[in-house]
Regions:
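Catalytic phosphate/metal-binding cores of nucleic-acid and nucleotide-processing enzymes, i.e., regions
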Residues: 1-112
Length: 112
């Protein structure tokens, strides 16, 4: 039986410790209160940062790198706006990717 996107997301979000912080990014519109929420249409399911150490010029300085993870189940489809957001984060020097498992997220985040 395939693991659901929600379950994969919870497992990946549990990696949020040490230098990695991931937060759920719900995107939508509440018609009753006329309020938009989330970053923007197509933005990733999990956003946050990954801390890295810069060397040699900034020896010892730790920097938070914007991190965006789009979580999909084994057969989940990536919408074009979601792919554009992931590509944009990459182009701007962030860490981003499509993850279908905790193993995918560990690889993306360089966690053992």
């Amino acid at each position: 039986m395939a693991v659901s996107e929600v379950e994969i997301m919870k497992q990946i979000q549990a990696l949020s410790r040490g230098g990695v912080r991931l937060f759920r990014n719900n995107v939508g519109f509440d018609a009753q209160n006329k309020v938009k929420y989330g970053l923007m249409p197509g933005s990733s399911d999990l956003i946050g940062w990954t801390q890295i150490e810069i060397t040699p010029h900034h020896v010892g300085l730790k920097v938070a790198i914007f991190t965006a993870i789009e979580v999909k189940s084994e057969f989940g489809r990536i919408r074009p706006d979601q792919q554009r957001f992931v590509d944009f984060v990459d182009e701007c020097g962030g860490i981003s990717g499509i993850c279908r498992s905790v193993a995918d997220a560990k690889t993306l985040l360089n966690l053992s």
